[in-house]
């Protein structure tokens, strides 16, 4: 089961467990607002989810309004249609919501959303009818779609009032209200009753953060290894040059000892090499010796080149 399907199923089951009449009505109102049409003709909701259609049927039935669910085969698959078309049921529906069906613009009636559970119920069925959530392994995104512009504005304000940090835009002529923040997506899922989906998202976020931390550390370690390898190679070349020129044995004992230890352990980091000495030496002290060896080698190379140039000009 996909993450979106899991969340949808949790929300649907929770919607069917509403106890207070005002909350059941708010849930039915959410369906009406986000249905395909809701006017004098009645109400029609089309969905690919049979459970959503059945939830709509049961919620309206609890409000005393009878509707029917039809299966309509389409090339892309079956579409489930919940409809309220019988004149008496249409009259009851509009009486339930205090509407006439002739409204020119649909906006949220705050009188139909009385308590906090009403808000949750309304947002939940809005999600069932016109919402989706992306798998958090890919990205954080939860959105609601509606063709009704004033409804979209009111719905954005409702989400903002409850600090879900919504945004609103238009896509292909449809109003889109979306939430992108991972914390807000988690909260709104839990608020709608998808507690397991919210917890799963939180766990996946923790795993993702751990992976990112490991990747950053690995990249840092790799960069440090590369830096260490380049530094070691530079020092080793300097020591080898001093050996070839017979200059190494003329140096102070501490420098000869440092050179010998580096040649015996060409891959060790400076910190690890310090521990090879008896007694151990400080990192700053050993670093100074290595830089001294490199400087001596460079100075010797420069003097040899100058002497060679003088010989050529004679």
What are these regions (language model features)?
Residues 16-25, 112-119, 249-253:
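Structural motif
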Residues 25-34, 121-129, 260:
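Short, hydrophobic/amphipathic alpha-helical patches that form generic packing surfaces
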Residues 295-305:
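Short, Lys/Arg-enriched C-terminal cap helix and immediately downstream tail that follows
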Residues 191-291:
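Extended mid-to-C-terminal alpha-helical interaction segments
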Residues 44-48, 143-146, 276-281:
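Short helix-coil junctions and helix-kink-helix linkers
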Residues 47, 54, 58-202:
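DNA-contacting interfaces and partner/effector-binding or oligomerization modules
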Residues 261, 304-314:
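Gram-positive cell-envelope targeting signals
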Residues 1-42, 46-60:
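N-terminal, positively charged regions that mediate nucleic acid binding
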């Amino acid at each position: 089961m996909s993450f979106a399907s899991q969340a949808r199923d949790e929300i649907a089951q929770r919607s069917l467990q509403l106890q207070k009449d005002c909350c059941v009505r708010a849930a039915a109102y959410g369906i009406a607002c986000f249905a395909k049409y809701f006017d004098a003709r009645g109400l029609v909701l089309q969905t690919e989810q049979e459970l959503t259609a059945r939830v709509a049927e049961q919620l309206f039935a609890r409000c005393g309004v009878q509707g029917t669910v039809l299966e309509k085969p389409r090339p892309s698959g079956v579409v489930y249609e919940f409809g309220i078309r019988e004149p008496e049921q249409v009259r009851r529906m509009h009486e339930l919501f205090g509407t006439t069906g002739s409204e020119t613009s649909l906006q949220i009636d705050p009188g139909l959303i009385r308590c906090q559970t009403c808000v949750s119920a309304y947002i939940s069925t809005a999600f069932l009818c016109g919402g989706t959530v992306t798998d958090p392994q890919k990205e954080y995104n939860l959105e609601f779609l509606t063709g009704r512009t004033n409804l979209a504005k009111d719905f954005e304000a409702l989400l903002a009032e409850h600090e879900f940090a919504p945004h609103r835009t238009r896509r292909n002529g449809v109003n889109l209200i979306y939430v992108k923040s991972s914390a807000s997506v988690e909260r709104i899922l839990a608020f709608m009753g998808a507690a397991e989906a919210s917890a799963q998202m939180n766990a996946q976020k923790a795993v993702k953060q751990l992976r990112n931390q490991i990747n950053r550390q690995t990249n840092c370690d790799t960069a440090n290894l590369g830096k260490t390898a380049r530094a070691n190679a530079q020092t080793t070349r300097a020591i080898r040059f001093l050996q070839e020129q017979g200059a190494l044995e003329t140096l102070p004992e501490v420098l000869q000892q440092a050179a010998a230890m580096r040649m015996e352990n060409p891959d060790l980091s400076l910190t690890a090499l310090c521990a090879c000495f008896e007694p151990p030496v400080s990192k700053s002290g050993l670093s100074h010796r290595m830089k001294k060896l490199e400087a001596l080698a460079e100075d010797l190379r420069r003097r040899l080149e100058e002497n060679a140039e003088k010989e050529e000009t004679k």
